């Protein structure tokens, strides 16, 4: 018994029929196209993650700058009140 109730002989017969219908060159081309599509998908996913990381870093820098500005204004306020 093979996959899902299909025996190994049935799988071999289907493989032979596919080879006869499409030929090896066309199957190689399809395999290459499929590999290229998978590679492109993975690249797009990693690019998306990199963009998300850059956005998070920019947000952290913005928050840090706002905190520094708030600290500076508080310090100036203290100086003016001390006078």
From Swiss-Prot:
<dbReference type="GO" id="GO:0043953">
    <property type="term" value="P:protein transport by the Tat complex"/>
</dbReference>
<keyword id="KW-1133">Transmembrane helix</keyword>
<comment type="function">
    <text>Part of the twin-arginine translocation (Tat) system that transports large folded proteins containing a characteristic twin-arginine motif in their signal peptide across membranes. TatA could form the protein-conducting channel of the Tat system.</text>
</comment>
<comment type="subunit">
    <text>The Tat system comprises two distinct complexes: a TatABC complex, containing multiple copies of TatA, TatB and TatC subunits, and a separate TatA complex, containing only TatA subunits. Substrates initially bind to the TatABC complex, which probably triggers association of the separate TatA complex to form the active translocon.</text>
</comment>
<keyword id="KW-0472">Membrane</keyword>
<dbReference type="GO" id="GO:0033281">
    <property type="term" value="C:TAT protein transport complex"/>
</dbReference>
<keyword id="KW-0811">Translocation</keyword>
<keyword id="KW-0997">Cell inner membrane</keyword>
<feature type="compositionally biased region" description="Basic and acidic residues">
    <location>
        <begin position="50"/>
        <end position="65"/>
    </location>
</feature>
<keyword id="KW-0813">Transport</keyword>
<dbReference type="InterPro" id="IPR006312">
    <property type="entry name" value="TatA/E"/>
</dbReference>
<keyword id="KW-1003">Cell membrane</keyword>
<dbReference type="Pfam" id="PF02416">
    <property type="entry name" value="TatA_B_E"/>
</dbReference>
<feature type="transmembrane region" description="Helical">
    <location>
        <begin position="2"/>
        <end position="22"/>
    </location>
</feature>
<dbReference type="GO" id="GO:0008320">
    <property type="term" value="F:protein transmembrane transporter activity"/>
</dbReference>
<comment type="similarity">
    <text>Belongs to the TatA/E family.</text>
</comment>
<protein>
    <recommendedName>
        <fullName>Sec-independent protein translocase protein TatA</fullName>
    </recommendedName>
</protein>
<keyword id="KW-0812">Transmembrane</keyword>
<dbReference type="InterPro" id="IPR003369">
    <property type="entry name" value="TatA/B/E"/>
</dbReference>
<feature type="compositionally biased region" description="Basic and acidic residues">
    <location>
        <begin position="74"/>
        <end position="83"/>
    </location>
</feature>
<keyword id="KW-0653">Protein transport</keyword>
<feature type="region of interest" description="Disordered">
    <location>
        <begin position="50"/>
        <end position="83"/>
    </location>
</feature>
């Amino acid at each position: 018994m093979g996959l899902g109730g299909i025996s190994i002989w049935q799988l071999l017969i289907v493989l032979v029929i596919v080879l006869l219908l499409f030929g090896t060159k066309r199957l190689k081309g399809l395999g290459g196209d499929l590999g290229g599509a998978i590679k492109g998908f993975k690249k797009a996913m990693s690019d998306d993650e990199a963009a998300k990381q850059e956005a998070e870093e920019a947000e952290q820098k913005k928050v840090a700058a706002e905190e520094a500005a708030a600290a500076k204004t508080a310090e100036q306020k203290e100086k003016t009140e001390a006078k």
